[in-house]
Amino acid sequence: MAASALRSCLNRDSDRGPDIAHTTALQPVILAGGAGTRLWPLSRADHPKPFLRLDGAQSPFQATVRRLEGLEAAPPMVVCNAAHRFLVAEQLEAIGVTAAAILLEPEGRNTAPAVALAALHARADGVDPVLLALPADHRMDHPAGFRAAVPAAGRAAAEGGLV
């Protein structure tokens, strides 16, 4: 069952059923998985790098969420492991953002399965949005350039491109 649903998500032309609305809506997906091992000893399993306030103002996760401000997009979905769901909720609340969903990975298996989980969840409502997958821990020095590029990238993806 999950395999056929995943195939449906990936095959944008021939496998789309009539119950899926064609849309160019942009659905941000923030990938906040991880084990907290790369920035040890600051980063730990219970408080990994995306949630640390390394520069004192906000965490990389919060900076990623804030980067979406001003875009025509749905509220973000966040994919994380169960141990971090409360960190995600607390950090979203601290910056005044409500997530569309906090999706829990049954087991961390890197980017592709996390994005597939988000795609399946997004399609559950009968729409087929363009997903904007964002790692929760990347630093971006020029967020205005990112915001300027997203609309064109979204249009290209809606037309079937892999951006």
Whereabouts are the PLM-identified features?
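Substrate-engagement module of ASCE P-loop NTPases
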Residues: 154-158
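A short, conserved acidic/glycine-rich loop-to-beta-strand motif
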Residues: 159-163
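Conserved N-terminal catalytic core of the sugar/cofactor nucleotidyltransferase
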Residues: 2-9, 13-30, 37-41, 45, ...
